[in-house]
Amino acid sequence: MDSLLKKQRQFLYQFKNVRWAKGRHETYLCYVVKRRDSPTSFSLDFGHLRNKAGCHVELLFLRYISDWDLDPGRCYRVTWFTSWSPCYDCARHVADFLRGYPNLSLRIFTARLYFCDKERKAEPEGLRRLHRAGVQIAIMTFKDYFYCWNTFVENHERTFKAWEGLHENSVRLSRQLRRILLPLYEVDDLRDAFRTLGL
């Protein structure tokens, strides 16, 4: 586990949602774990991780939370803020992990979409697999960056300032993510329509 708070410069560099993210070869993950008790929730832990040699950050988090003694009678919500969306293999591992913990829900807010093999189209399929497993996936917006800045960054009481293009890139990436997940949304919409009609 890294130190509790990230350095400002490191956060801004690693999480910046630029179109061409050259030199950003690691994934950083900020997380919040909450236990849900009726309509209220109780924070259990928060922090951040990054890739270690030979192990992606998503798998590091799964190892970390696997050591917890999660009460099967309680509901838990995990929220990730990631610099890159998960690769296909990590998405598969996360979906499989969640299958074993039906009382744990996951939300992922990502700065950028990761695609390492454009010919294979594996990463988009990994995102669809996560969505089918019940994971809420979204692109980080100003509100998410602001939250991360105030929760995970050693900000010395400086206010978060958006960089040029933050909003436009969030919109562009959100549209791209929507196109990736669109077939699943259409199936969900059809399912809801049939349910409404009683079919």
From Swiss-Prot:
Catalyzed reaction equations: a 2'-deoxycytidine in single-stranded DNA + H2O + H(+) = a 2'-deoxyuridine in single-stranded DNA + NH4(+)
Active-site residues, as the UniProt record annotates them: E58 (proton donor)
Post-translational modification note: Ser-38 is the major site whereas Thr-27 is the minor site of phosphorylation. Phosphorylation regulates its class-switch recombination activity.
MF GO annotations: cytidine deaminase activity; RNA binding; zinc ion binding
Annotated stretches, region: Required for interaction with RNF126: 88-116
Entry comment describing in which tissues the protein is expressed: Expressed in lymph nodes, spleen and thymus.
Family note: Belongs to the cytidine and deoxycytidylate deaminase family.
Protein function: Single-stranded DNA-specific cytidine deaminase. Involved in somatic hypermutation (SHM), gene conversion, and class-switch recombination (CSR) in B-lymphocytes by deaminating C to U during transcription of Ig-variable (V) and Ig-switch (S) region DNA. Required for several crucial steps of B-cell terminal differentiation necessary for efficient antibody responses. May also play a role in the epigenetic regulation of gene expression by participating in DNA demethylation.
Oligomeric form and interacting partners: Interacts with CTNNBL1; the interaction is important for the immunoglobulin switch activity of AICDA. Interacts (via its NLS) with KPNA1. Interacts with PKA/PRKACA and PRKAR1A/PKR1. Interacts with SUPT6H, TRIM28 and NCL. Directly interacts with MCM3AP; this interaction may favor AICDA recruitment to immunoglobulin variable region genes, hence promoting somatic hypermutations.
Region annotation Interaction with SUPT6H: where it falls in the sequence: 2-26
Subcellular localization: Nucleus; Cytoplasm
Cofactor requirements of the protein: Zn(2+)
Motif Nuclear export signal, residue range(s) on this chain: 184-199
CMP/dCMP-type deaminase domain sequence ranges: 23-130
Family matches, as InterPro entries: APOBEC/CMP_deaminase_Zn-bd (IPR016192), APOBEC_Cyt_Deaminase (IPR050610), APOBEC_N (IPR013158), CMP_dCMP_dom (IPR002125), Cytidine_deaminase-like (IPR016193)
Residues with PTM Phosphothreonine: T27
Official protein name in the record: Single-stranded DNA cytosine deaminase
Gene Ontology CC terms, in alphabetical order: cytoplasm; nucleus; P-body
Region described as Important for interaction with CTNNBL1: spans on this chain: 39-42
EC number: 3.5.4.38
Keywords for this protein: Cytoplasm, Hydrolase, Metal-binding, mRNA processing, Nucleus, Phosphoprotein, Ubl conjugation, Zinc
Pfam families to which the protein is assigned, alphabetical: APOBEC_N
CDD domains: cytidine_deaminase (cd01283)
GO BP terms in the entry: cytidine deamination; cytidine to uridine editing; defense response to virus; DNA cytosine deamination; mRNA processing; negative regulation of single stranded viral RNA replication via double stranded DNA intermediate; positive regulation of gene expression via chromosomal CpG island demethylation; somatic hypermutation of immunoglobulin genes
